[in-house]
Regions:
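Copper-binding active sites and cupredoxin-like electron-transfer domains
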Residues: 1-92
Length: 92
């Protein structure tokens, strides 16, 4: 797991570098996040629990985990998740 302090700002840089798939997503369980799409603004354009990126697209996600525990993340493309593209944030 990726360990973070409870309540601390977490910033995740995500990008879709998958050549054989037109889209990839990032979904966070039990928490939502602000989405800063690259090159668009210094103000988040979305607040959600899932972001979908096209090939070559990238974004910065920001959130805080308010409670101790494990928060699962994964793509909604099952073949990517089955190949290991999933994990946990552990808030301590």
């Amino acid at each position: 797991p990726i360990t973070v302090p409870v309540g601390a700002l977490v910033r995740v840089h995500v990008l879709n570098m998958v050549e054989y798939d037109p889209v990839a997503s990032f979904h966070l369980h039990a928490q939502t996040f602000d989405v800063f799409r690259t090159g668009t603004s210094t103000v988040p354009g979305e607040h959600t629990d899932t972001v979908t990126l096209t090939q070559g697209e990238r974004a910065i996600l920001e959130f805080r985990l308010p409670e101790r525990g494990r928060y699962m993340f994964h793509p909604h493309q099952h073949h990517m998740a089955d190949a290991g593209a999933m994990g946990w944030f552990s808030a301590v």
